[in-house]
Amino acid sequence: MKTRKSHPIKRFFEQETAGGILLIVAAALAMLLANSPFYGHYDLLIDTPFIISLGDFALEKPLLLWTNDGLMAVFFLLVGLELKRELLEGELSDPRKIALPAVGAIGGMLVPALIYWWINKDNPLALSGWAIPAATDIAFALGVLALLGSRVPVTVKIFLTSIAVFDDIGAILIIAFFYTSKISMLALVVAAICCAILFICNRSGVTTLRAYLLIGLVMWVALLKSGVHATLGGVILAFFIPMTAARPHPEIKIPSPLKFLEHELHAPVAFLILPIFAFANSGIRFIGMGVEDFTHSVPVGIASGLFFGKQLGVFLFCGVCVLFGWLKLPKGMRWVHLYGVAVLCGIGFTMSLFIGSLAFQESGINSVIDERLGIVFGSLVSAVLGFVVLRSAKQKA
């Protein structure tokens, strides 16, 4: 039984880490193109308009926004499915196991946001980016852990993943409450009706995924038109997908609709959606930039929040709880592992880029460049230091 249980965990980390490495490659390729003679073609590609029409109804957006509003809704659907499964029967179903990563995640969101606020408190326009350094990119972080192989205990990977899950919950709440534009009540009513239908389907024992996905698509369009960020539709839909299916006979085993959909989405999200997102959002053109671009309060605040704030928040909040005897480190984890994980939490990348696109969507191009500079620098330094710390942990063991 023990061997069977280890397979899904092993498959999860193999897929997440491989996706993280592909994410790094996609981001590097975008930066390479943006700083090459082909940068015009890159800009033209991400700004290419795509239209979806049905009768009088039409949606027209550039590729960049289709990626951020559409593909990322599928990513958040997967995040929601993982959250529901973890809360019902996974690591997050045991309060004793979730307390320490939950505390770490809270510290890892509060301290970076405070550092960013302190650096940008005199710049009202920049303050809208306070949540950018509060995010953690689990795929990127696990990609770094993959480079360490067996040097890192599995408990360390599970602990990092648990922190990232709570981080995702925080990011979802932040997007819902702080990055919502003007509300269209009619579209919001349509979205609410979709939620009601999804609830009825769930309570009535409907297990056909097509029904949920079709209603979810209508809800996504309604949210897109309502002013509430459409990616939240993915999370809402996920929590209505049934965990179990009714058995026509006790001996007949019916697969879980939620687990089936989660399994089907993992590969497309890891190997297609997130790399496309990274490619579309990472094309920073360094040519022509001056010192003032790198020392602007926005990139400095983001980089400081990710690098200093994340490690300080996660390590300090967890450390205090362990030292006072309120909580315990997971079995097989040492203080150096906790610090290494805290540093890796500073890899914000895709989630930070996404929140940044919402925070500065009304601003000019300079704000966008400033935001991405800080994210890339803070994430890169966190990745390098986290790798060094965890690699040295094995040598000292």
UniProtKB/Swiss-Prot annotation:
Keywords: Antiport, Cell inner membrane, Cell membrane, Ion transport, Membrane, Sodium, Sodium transport, Transmembrane, Transmembrane helix, Transport. It is found in: Cell inner membrane. It catalyses: Na(+)(in) + 2 H(+)(out) = Na(+)(out) + 2 H(+)(in). Pfam families: Na_H_antiport_1. GO terms for cellular component: plasma membrane. It is a multi-pass membrane protein. The chain crosses the membrane at residues 18-38, 63-83, 98-118, 129-149, 158-178, 181-201, 207-224, 269-289, 306-326, 340-360, 373-393. GO terms for biological process: regulation of pH. GO terms for molecular function: sodium:proton antiporter activity. Belongs to the NhaA Na(+)/H(+) (TC 2.A.33) antiporter family. NCBIfam families: NhaA, PRK09560.1, PRK09561.1. Na(+)/H(+) antiporter that extrudes sodium in exchange for external protons. HAMAP family: NhaA (MF_01844). This is Na(+)/H(+) antiporter NhaA 3.
